[in-house]
Amino acid sequence: MSDYTKYTKQEMQAYAIAKSIKENQIVIVGTGLPLIGASLAKRAICPSCHPIVESGLMDCDPVEVPRSVGDNRFMAHCAVQWPNIRFVGFEANEWLHDEDRLVAFIGGAQIDPYGNVNSTCIFGKGDYLQPTTRFTGSGGANGIATYCNTIIMMQHQKRRFIDHVDYITSCGWMDGPGGREIGRAHV
């Protein structure tokens, strides 16, 4: 019998992602832990799930763990490769038809108590135009956070969990309960 008591926090997070995916769900994932978790789910836990990534690949079944959503190892065994433009709006359309069938996992550099995620930049002593650190940005995360049953998965470090994100890349409840109501002004 194998000893499964020696694992890293990241391995446990990837496993938690894989276990929360259900049969026949469409699973939108980005690079990193979400990609690893979805790959594990497809390979070992629920082979009828359908991972999809922002580069347009759907129903991926990688032989090896891909390094990014555009990795050729991901492309080799996917059912569909859409042009990126077709991915835009997919989440909204799927959500309108069956919101329980669609789940997504995103990460980020910062998250606040209202679920707003920053994956764009850390201001530090600067601002948006001259931040201390700049990241790749939204990718598809903004649409995912808006239209999908979204699970936010990030490394558990105190500096990531803050009162107000420096920049809202993907909105949660904006400034609190009711923060996503149509027509409500936000600051």
Model-identified regions with their sequence ranges:
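N-terminal active-site beta-alpha-beta segment that forms phosphate/nucleotide-binding
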Residues: 1-82, 186
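Conserved phosphate- and dinucleotide-binding cores of soluble alpha/beta proteins
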Residues: 2, 9-11, 65-184
